[in-house]
């Protein structure tokens, strides 16, 4: 669920996800096209691809269970579909954390009209 994903990102990065990631680069937030602008944008590209592989439910609005154990995200024993979505969100939140040093404020509200490179496939 998007609210759970928001909490994961906040916990991993310390950043407010809606401000910092909802409109970042070419892939963070709704949709995506072109080539990811940097490592943070690539986190969103990979997250989009991960969601595309999950079929049979709506990854944005289905709830899953997870916990934080010693600072690590642990996805719960949900049915396959929701567990996989949790893993997608977990990987993205960790990716954001791992790429904090290269986060660029200039991509924070990047207009997608500048995402003109050929779109990569998953």
Curated annotation (Swiss-Prot):
It catalyses: a 1,2-diacyl-sn-glycero-3-phosphocholine + H2O = a 1-acyl-sn-glycero-3-phosphocholine + a fatty acid + H(+). It is found in: Secreted. The keyword tRNA-binding does not apply. Its cofactor is Ca(2+). GO terms for molecular function: calcium ion binding; calcium-dependent phospholipase A2 activity; phospholipid binding; toxin activity. One of its GO terms (cellular component) is extracellular region. GO terms for biological process: arachidonate secretion; lipid catabolic process; negative regulation of T cell proliferation; phospholipid metabolic process. Ca(2+) binds at residues 27, 29, 31, 48. Its EC number is 3.1.1.4. SMART domains: PA2c. Pfam families: Phospholip_A2_1 (PF00068). InterPro entries: PLipase_A2, PLipase_A2_dom, PLipase_A2_dom_sf, PLipase_A2_His_AS. Disulfide bonds join 26-115, 28-44, 43-95, 49-122, 50-88, 57-81, 75-86. Gene3D superfamilies: Phospholipase A2 domain. Binds 1 Ca(2+) ion. The active site is at 47, 89. The keyword Isomerase does not apply. Keywords: Calcium, Disulfide bond, Hydrolase, Lipid degradation, Lipid metabolism, Metal-binding, Secreted, Toxin. PLA2 catalyzes the calcium-dependent hydrolysis of the 2-acyl groups in 3-sn-phosphoglycerides. Belongs to the phospholipase A2 family. Group II subfamily. D49 sub-subfamily. This is Basic phospholipase A2 PL-X. It comes from Protobothrops flavoviridis (Habu).
